[in-house]
Regions:
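Sequence-pattern detector for short linear motifs
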Residues: 6, 22-24, 82
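N-terminal secretory signal peptides that target proteins for export/translocation
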Residues: 1-20
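Compact, glycine-rich, soluble single-domain proteins
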Residues: 46-173
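Bacterial N-terminal signal peptides
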Residues: 23-40
């Protein structure tokens, strides 16, 4: 009798173990591939939401001799999205945020690519305070007292046009 022979049941067990390991490896590889394919699309969906299908309504505001064309964000969804992912904002264009009632409103710049200035505006149109906001930051920028409106413009717009705290805007909805 040879000492280095392997019985048939032992060979069968070795082949069965190898087959199970191969199947497990294939399943693991398929799972990893599926996860790898899903991650970029999930990350992309979080960073680049689909822009609104319909354009927002606009209104014309005036600050003395200066005319502003403002998109109106007057729903929770439009206020939440604001100017996120926009790559440009024309000269006298901005976004007017309209709230149901006065409150101390706070804004941040998550996913906002443009540097902006924001004017917090009381019910009567008086600017309460103006803040400059850096792109893609989460620092809070808040009204100094309850306001019903906030107007975002390109950073420096208010300063360049001599519009300061206490100035009154006309044409608010």
């Amino acid at each position: 009798m040879l000492k280095n022979t392997v019985s048939f049941p032992a060979i069968h067990t070795l082949f069965e173990t190898a087959r199970i390991k191969a199947a497990a490896s294939a399943a693991l590889a398929a799972t990893l591939a599926a996860v790898a394919l899903a991650l970029p699309s999930a990350a992309g969906a979080q960073q680049h939401p689909t822009p609104p299908q319909a354009p927002l309504p606009t209104t014309q505001l005036s600050a003395g001799i200066h005319i502003i064309r403002a998109e109106v964000a007057n729903t929770e969804a439009t206020r939440r999205d604001g100017l996120m992912f926009r790559r440009e904002l024309a000269g006298n264009d901005g976004m007017l945020f309209v709230f149901e009632r006065p409150d101390v409103q706070c804004f941040w710049m998550r996913n906002t690519l443009l540097p902006l200035s924001i004017a917090f505006i009381a019910d009567d149109g008086t600017i309460v305070n103006i803040e400059d906001m850096a792109p893609q930051t989460e620092d809070p920028h808040c009204a100094k007292k309850p306001v019903r409106y906030a107007l975002e413009m390109a950073q420096g717009w208010f300063d360049q046009h001599g519009i300061k705290t206490g100035k009154k805007l006309d044409g608010l909805p």
